[in-house]
Amino acid sequence: MKIKFQKYQGTGNDFVLIDNRSKVFPKDNTTFISQLCDRRFGIGCDGLILLENSEISDFKMCYYNADGKEGSLCGNGARCTVAFADFLKLIDNKTTFEASDGMHTAIIANEIIYLQMHDVNKIETFDKHSFLDTGSPHHVQMVEDLKTFDVFAIGKKIREGAPYNKTGTNVNFVEQISNNQFAIRTYERGVEDETLSCGTG
């Protein structure tokens, strides 16, 4: 099978993008998708995105994590999908598109893509962390010395542990640098590793 694809990245979060308006891509084949995402034996990426037709907007974004399973909203992936739709000449400078969490609008201005996210209606605060859903679930925890923090081991433990268990969550570790500056490192579910950035976190 020959598949045309493009590779995009948003602040280091990288994706394979495929025009699937003809519905030929085997999107139910999780093994195949995970093989394409594999960095050693495939193309290599944090996630795979299919651009499909939508009956209610300019296009539909279907996002798959590197494990091959369909994922929740990916903010950087959404910006890359808008850039891909622009490349395909499907949109002008403003677009409305469909994603897993509903409708989104985006604007392209001076080659920068501005994406409107959904408002966060609820933030749950606990002793050592907070939890919120921005279109994807996020466990947010303040830490010290973020540079040496073991994001992989601790992130994996939180992602797989209670109360998230099998469903899992993204895990953000945050260090406050100054009054209005923060550093963030993220363990992403589905990728099951730290990524260079996370658009929803």
What are these regions (language model features)?
Residues 1-110, 140-200:
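A glycine-rich beta-to-alpha transition motif near the start of alpha/beta enzyme domains, typified by
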Residues 104, 118, 129, 138-139:
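Histidine (H) residue identity feature
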Residues 115-128, 153-156:
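Active-site glycine-rich loop that binds ribose-phosphate moieties when present
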Residues 132:
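Short glycine/Trp-rich loop-beta-loop segment that forms part of the substrate-binding cleft
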